[in-house]
Amino acid sequence: MINYIKPYGSNPFVGNLSTPVNSSKVTIWYLKNLPIYRRGLSPLLRGLEIGMAHGYFIIGPFYKLGPLRNTDLSLLSGLIAAIGLIIISSIAMIIYGIVTFDNSENNDKLQTANGWRQLASGFLLGAVGGAGFAYILLANNLLSTSTPILQT
């Protein structure tokens, strides 16, 4: 077992260990295909893709576990709470980009404040759209036939 775990890049001062999980070709391929690391995407499209996925799944906990879960308004309150969290997250992303990066020219657009602003804008648009899409599916009871866990 000791032969499988080595310092990352054979440098013990990096602070990371190279294990069979984090250095395998499958893991590296998977991480390179995530939208945040995928080459050729603008920050707006990266944010849009990330936002759609997050907006779609973020409505569920508010809908099923929120304080109005046993009322007729549970789905609507879940949508409103999800949109509120999405707005707060987008504002936090914009603030992070402003305080972390400057507006100097960089080959990677995500390493600039303007790139992070575009990422946050795409995230906001995609997440609200994803939450709205999930709301439409749940409101029309389209998921109840395929997933019995939602019928409670």
UniProtKB/Swiss-Prot annotation:
Pfam families: PsaL (PF02605)
Stromal domain ranges by topology: 1-72, 145-152
Name of the coding gene: psaL
GO-annotated cellular components: chloroplast thylakoid membrane; photosystem I reaction center
Membrane topology field: Multi-pass membrane protein
Residue pairs linked by disulfide bridges in the UniProt entry: none
Keyword terms of this UniProt record: Chloroplast, Membrane, Photosynthesis, Photosystem I, Plastid, Thylakoid, Transmembrane, Transmembrane helix
Keyword Aminoacyl-tRNA synthetase tagged: no
All ranges on the Lumenal side of the membrane: 94-123
Name this polypeptide is given: Photosystem I reaction center subunit XI
UniProt record similarity statement: Belongs to the PsaL family.
Species name: Cyanidium caldarium (Red alga)
SUPFAM superfamilies in the record: Photosystem I reaction center subunit XI, PsaL
GO biological process, one term: photosynthesis
Subcellular location: Plastid, Chloroplast thylakoid membrane
